[in-house]
């Protein structure tokens, strides 16, 4: 008997809709990363992308515990001398709430070409509207 290895072209990829309202950022992100990798499937193979597509709505309504709203910092560098920009989680949620979830999930995925492919299957929207109704996503309760 040989070991089963999933083939990328035969993997069944489903679309799921996740409502982030009232969910904790870290706990939500770990489950999203797990499903993007495909670890919830019995056909999971480490070197093959077996994950599903995830549509996350209501990103502006996520919850964090403790003082993370003021203490957690996001840094970005423009490339110019002295232009290291820093903003708190509270400011980031006001400016672009969907990017907070994207950054958290991206850090939990593998670094490399396959990780980037997995990351592209994550669609995050700040409101309750999304343009993926044609894919008929199933509601996923996390």
Curated annotation (Swiss-Prot):
A Gene Ontology biological process term: negative regulation of translation
The keyword Ribosomal protein appears for this protein: yes
Pfam families reported in the protein's UniProt record: Ribosomal_L13 (PF00572)
GO molecular-function terms, A-Z: mRNA binding; structural constituent of ribosome
CC annotations in GO: cytosolic large ribosomal subunit
Swiss-Prot/TrEMBL keywords: Ribonucleoprotein, Ribosomal protein
InterPro entries, A to Z: Ribosomal_uL13, Ribosomal_uL13_bac-type, Ribosomal_uL13_CS, Ribosomal_uL13_sf
Domain of life assignment: Bacteria
Subunit structure as annotated in this protein's UniProt entry: Part of the 50S ribosomal subunit.
Protein's job: This protein is one of the early assembly proteins of the 50S ribosomal subunit, although it is not seen to bind rRNA by itself. It is important during the early stages of 50S assembly.
Family: Belongs to the universal ribosomal protein uL13 family.
Cross-referenced HAMAP family: Ribosomal_uL13 (MF_01366)
Protein name: Large ribosomal subunit protein uL13
């Amino acid at each position: 008997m040989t070991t089963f290895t999933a083939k990328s072209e035969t993997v069944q990829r489903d679309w799921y809709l996740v409502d982030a309202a009232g969910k904790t950022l870290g706990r939500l992100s770990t489950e999203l990363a797990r499903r993007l990798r495909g670890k919830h499937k019995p056909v999971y193979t480490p070197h093959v992308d077996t994950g599903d597509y995830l549509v996350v709505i209501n990103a502006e309504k996520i919850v964090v515990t403790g003082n993370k709203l003021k203490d957690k910092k996001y840094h970005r560098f423009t490339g110019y001398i002295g232009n290291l920009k820093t903003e708190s989680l509270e400011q980031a949620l006001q400016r672009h709430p969907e990017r907070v979830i994207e950054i958290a999930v991206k850090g939990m995925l593998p670094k490399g070409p396959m990780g980037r492919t997995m990351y592209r299957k994550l669609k995050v929207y700040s409101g309750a509207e999304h343009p993926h109704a044609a894919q008929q996503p199933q509601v996923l309760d996390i």
